[in-house]
Amino acid sequence: MSNTQKQLALAKAAKKSVNTADTEEKNRALLAMADSLEAATADILAANRQDLEAAAGNIPESMTDRLLLDGKRICAMADGIRAVAALPNPVGEILETSTLPNGLEIVKKRVAMGVIGIIYESRPNVTSDAAALALKSGSAVVLRSGKDAFQSARAIVAALKTGLAQTRIDPDALQLIEDTGRESSYEMMRAKDYLDLLIPRGGAGLIRAVVENAVVPVIETGTGIVHIYIDKDADWDKALRIVYNAKTSRPSVCNSMEVLLVHEDIAADFLPKLERLLVRDRIEAGLPPIRFRLDPQAARHIGGEAAGADDFDTEFLDYILAVKTVASVEEAVWHIETHSTHHSDGIVTENRHAADYFTTHIDSAAVYVNASTRFTDGGEFGLGCEMGISTQKLHARGPMGLKELTSYKYIVQGTGQVRE
């Protein structure tokens, strides 16, 4: 048995302590974990510095922001755990009841998933978010961090397990796979005897590898090739504010805009205003400017590189924006449906017909009208921190909160009935 299998077995053995814990026990554990996380701030920051030093020069500036921890972010992680503790316990919820003609009473009841595996890349906050959500939803959790964030993840998990040790929940219900080699990921993908669900969080390569190789049931948290279409009837003040926020607030996250579509009737006047906002104003403010990848029509109005064959199919996660002009809302929808990963896509318009057409025909987990796509987030949706953004349709879609991490069973109460 490999070390990874041993850790999977420990989580499976400990799952009953979580599966059967009541609301008070789970909340007590989460609050202890949050306190312990804050108490370990110095250790976590020291570990994070190791990760940052190892990554220096090897990852883009925008990705460094994902990896970076400071005291404020650790406090936010702890507060995120406390927010999960404050959410209703999904386990035990009665979903449906019915009584059959023969007198059998059937209850459909929400239950814990069991053991959830998470494979993720260089985002230390995922460690605490995933642990909190899994435990509150009644499941043990096995985490497999990317190598870039491993020292941070190890320090975070050590703190969380210290908190768990003060409660009735077995600390073994939280595991961080120590082996950062690729084989440990494949062991988790094949671990159907230990894992009830596997969730990948990361770039397209990781997600594709898990979806194509896993024998464990998977919820796909897809990449975010996120589009915003500026209609000819858009309010320009709204449009500029939305585009600025959707692209620049955190370009390294999956709900950040990657492709801007602009109606050709307004492109000649709108795009230069956008260029001023995203390039010259940011340079004057000492901020990284947005670098444009332009189709031939957009290139007539602003400066930038010519868009390559793959630029409208790329999740840049950087200060790069692909820009294209379109002749109608119908063409915008066609382009999005051709290139979208069905994560989050939006329209800016004051035309109700255009908005209705867009929301009807765009098949994404979140579809926006006159708002930034950056809101696709469990916290912003009122779900607490989320396990990821599901882009598939089965079991879960969009931000995955507590309910999306559970299953259900039927309880059938009889009085001696037998089937004829």
Curated annotation (Swiss-Prot):
Its EC number is 1.2.1.41. GO terms for molecular function: glutamate-5-semialdehyde dehydrogenase activity; NADP binding. It is found in: Cytoplasm. Its main location: cytoplasm. SUPFAM superfamilies: ALDH-like (SSF53720). PROSITE patterns: PROA (PS01223). Keywords: Amino-acid biosynthesis, Cytoplasm, NADP, Oxidoreductase, Proline biosynthesis. One of its GO terms (biological process) is L-proline biosynthetic process. It is an enzyme of class 1 (oxidoreductase). Pathway: Amino-acid biosynthesis; L-proline biosynthesis; L-glutamate 5-semialdehyde from L-glutamate: step 2/2. The keyword NADP applies. InterPro entries: Ald_DH/histidinol_DH (IPR016161), Ald_DH_C (IPR016163), Ald_DH_N (IPR016162), Aldehyde_DH_dom (IPR015590), G-glutamylP_reductase_CS (IPR020593), Glu-5-SA_DH (IPR012134), GPR_dom (IPR000965). NCBIfam families: PRK00197.1 (NF001221), proA (TIGR00407). Belongs to the gamma-glutamyl phosphate reductase family. This is Gamma-glutamyl phosphate reductase. It comes from Neisseria meningitidis serogroup B (strain ATCC BAA-335 / MC58).
